[in-house]
Amino acid sequence: MDVVSISSDGFIVALLKAELILTANIIAGLAVGELILVSGVVEYLFAPVAPRLALWGIHDKIASAMVIAIGAPRSGAAIISGAYSDGEITRREATYGTLSLAFPAYLRRWAGTVAMAVGIAGRTGLIFAFVLVIRSACRFIWVVIMLSKRGVKRVAGRASLKGRESIGARERISRVFLMLKRSLPMAWFFFALTYALVPFADRAFSKYLTNPALYKIIPAEGWAVAISSIAHVTAGLSSAAGAIGTGSIDIGQAVLALLVGNMAGSITRTMRQNVGYWVGIFPRDLVPNLLRWHLITTVTLEVLSIMLIWCASLVIPFG
């Protein structure tokens, strides 16, 4: 959305609607997470595999959050938030556990993504979609390896938790309301700030990508594809299909351009979609570390995937 091109009244209305959706997501996520924790479903489902998970250093709450994230990623994050607040997992486990939810959640969407990508851009879309899912899988493996450090100590640590007194319903409800009271104002402010600044950041990326010096890597038509994909993947795929159809770029250059645009847009998407929710459900001390490692793991693999596709385009005739 272009803030400059609409009236201030229209912007405020759109912002308020977005804030309401954010608030509903935060409240619903925390409520569902607490219900799952208090129901005992996690312990029942994961008791058979708990010893093996313990050897890998993965807490049963985190493992359950991974499964739940396939259908409801925000509920999975709320489970981790509740376990962290209960003292069942450490800050390190909460950080990497939350990051691990992205891949299970993406798998559910990926079937639709690949179908759409192939439908719009054919072989280009297929390659692009597979790069995205492979990159997401590599990130999942990375954070799970980080999560599984010191795994041998998890068995003793879990045993000591069994004798801990369970938290009552009243205390859980009180904790949720206290968390909402402390975190919602910050979430609202941060979301509003990001909502207002993201369009300017997108335009700054777009202006940078039109630098003629970059045409040595990708033709001008390819950068047009990259700029389109900053806004939305569908726009980028459509631009790629058009550019390939006119012979302006080949498939390798189109995939490279799509990945560059995807990387440029991922930073603003993180600020717009992830951080506001994290601020709403996690304690404040956890969010900076979570954001830092999210960017480190995401941007590192995005850069590596771009480099690999660029090298491949030099030696492999994509067509």
Language model feature labels by segment:
Residues 12-20, 122-131, 181, 247-248, ...:
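Interfacial loop-to-helix junctions that mark the boundaries of transmembrane helices
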Residues 88-147, 254-257, 276-308:
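Membrane-core helix-loop-helix motifs of multi-pass transport proteins
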Residues 2-44:
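N-terminal signal-anchor module of multipass membrane proteins
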